[in-house]
């Protein structure tokens, strides 16, 4: 299989390591990386900053049409502003799962994500419905998982890197609530694609996981 046509879908719940691994893997391979979760967070940021209610779907859809999202050099831009750091706020984190349930939001972002898939070679895309909905024809599908304690510790470390001090018990509670929403939502729920490879990241380092995925890529390309 020609390298330029290779696309990888990486899915998993919050804290499973999918964004970190996808970013590191893309850097190692020199490929493109799209973090779809960042798209949902960017839209959430816009709604919060502009005090837009997401309960009136008709008016919300009109507003969504005016929002421009784009990726460049692993940074996400909201109406031409780099919001890569802003979207990591606790306020965005608190509301993003509710915004992600809105049909109009999912429709807008699914269209954008599919356009990116169609026009981007050597692509690694991570999220919650990439292998099942966004990129079902991906050359390699991976579903990452980890136990709740490990996921909470990772989230706490990520928060600390962003200057936020958070309580591990509260993080675990939030992760469980997020899991319930993600697995049970009506539109594009979080689920493992039938042909996805399950990798438990609980006891694996980033380097070990990247080595495993690199081996899987090589096997797929030889097939």
From Swiss-Prot:
GO terms for cellular component: cytosol. It is found in: Cytoplasm. The keyword ATP-binding applies. One of its GO terms (biological process) is pyrimidine nucleotide metabolic process. It catalyses: CMP + ATP = CDP + ADP; dCMP + ATP = dCDP + ADP. The keyword Nucleotide-binding applies. It is an enzyme of class 2 (transferase). It comes from the Bacteria. One of its GO terms (molecular function) is CMP kinase activity. Keywords: ATP-binding, Cytoplasm, Kinase, Nucleotide-binding, Transferase. Its EC number is 2.7.4.25. ATP binds at residues 12-20. It holds the Pfam family Cytidylate_kin. Disulfide bonds: none annotated. NCBIfam families: cmk. PANTHER family: CYTIDYLATE KINASE, CYTIDYLATE KINASE/PANTOATE-BETA-ALANINE LIGASE. Belongs to the cytidylate kinase family. Type 1 subfamily. This is Cytidylate kinase. It comes from Aster yellows witches'-broom phytoplasma (strain AYWB).
């Amino acid at each position: 299989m020609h390298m330029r046509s290779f696309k990888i879908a990486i899915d998993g719940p919050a804290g499973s390591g999918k964004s970190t691994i996808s970013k590191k893997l893309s850097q190692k391979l020199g490929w493109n990386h799209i973090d779809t979760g960042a798209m949902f967070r960017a839209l959430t940021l816009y709604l919060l900053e502009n005090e837009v209610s997401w309960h009136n779907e008709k008016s919300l859809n009109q507003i969504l049409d005016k929002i421009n999202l784009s990726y460049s050099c692993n940074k996400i831009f909201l109406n031409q502003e780099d919001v890569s750091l802003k979207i990591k706020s606790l306020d965005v984190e608190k509301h993003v799962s509710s915004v992600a349930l809105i049909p109009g939001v999912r429709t807008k972002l699914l269209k954008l994500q599919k356009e990116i898939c169609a026009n981007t070679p050597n692509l690694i895309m991570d999220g919650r419905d990439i292998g099942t909905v966004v990129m079902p024809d991906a050359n390699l599908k991976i579903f990452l998982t980890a136990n709740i304690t490990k996921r909470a510790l990772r989230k706490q470390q990520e928060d600390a890197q962003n200057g936020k001090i958070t309580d591990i018990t509260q993080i675990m509670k939030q992760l469980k609530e997020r899991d319930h929403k993600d697995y049970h939502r009506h539109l594009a729920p979080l689920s493992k694609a039938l042909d996805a490879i399950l990798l438990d990241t609980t006891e694996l380092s980033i380097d070990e996981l990247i080595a495993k995925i690199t081996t899987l890529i090589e096997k797929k390309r030889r097939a």
